[in-house]
């Protein structure tokens, strides 16, 4: 299986620290571990604190599959992530 780096850019409806606390929660870390997904970077746009970049690395298609999982979508949205604002790019 190829290693893939996935870049998510999206808007949030809560302060970044609040969103990051959910992303860094034990539950989310466990979900990522089970899928062999590693967070390489997360941050906010310099001039727009509602714009987030998240860079993850894992097996090909793993990050996108988790993001698109209907069971995970409510967790994503409950963190303040505006789901429909998400742009995804993948790199090998």
Residue spans for each PLM region:
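Short S/T/G/P-rich N-terminal loop/turn motif that feeds into the first structured element of a domain
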Residues: 1-74, 82-92
